[in-house]
Amino acid sequence: MRRILLSLLLLYSVTVFCQPAGVTLDTLHIKHIDFQGKTQTGVLICNQKIADDLQEIFAELYKAKYPIERIRPISEYQDDDERSMRANNTSCYCYRVVEGSKTLSNHARGLAIDVNPLYNPCVRRKKDGTILIQPDTGKPYVNRAKAFKYKITKDDLCYRLFIQHGFKWGGNWRTVKDYQHFEKPDL
């Protein structure tokens, strides 16, 4: 059943034919608490190698009533990562390159996930010195010293659970700060 659902979801994705060789994707149905405090069931497409970790992490987040606005496949946003992030959509698989490079992102292998990306933007300095914020609507949440809801920090349950499961956090990177991003790049 999960394979059939995955096939149907990917049917509408322009990136389905770009899936890297040797990558097996899985579809997870993830219970979560939305920003209105209601239980929702989201759909997460990920690499089969991290499926069990993600199920355990999100089960703990759900039990703790940790708010996640939405969890939908990137195909619901016409494979547009910026559009998905602006909608504060938590997602995993997205066939794309790392911004500003020709290198495949770990999202393209389903080994990376972005959680509540609007409130936890990716911030990078481009070669011309300008600052790139993704999503572009995440500018109010760049200053991590400010107090605001849904912010991932090292004290946050979301951070702790992903780290306990062996993920690396983009908020710890030196040059780019990708506060929404967790990955297992070495699988």
Task: List the predicted regions and their residue ranges.
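Extracellular/periplasmic catalytic domains that process cell-envelope and extracellular macromolecules
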Residues: 21-24, 104-110, 163
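Surface-exposed patches in mature extracellular/periplasmic domains of secreted proteins
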Residues: 65-76, 104, 169-176
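Mid-length scaffold segments of soluble, non-membrane domains
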Residues: 83-118
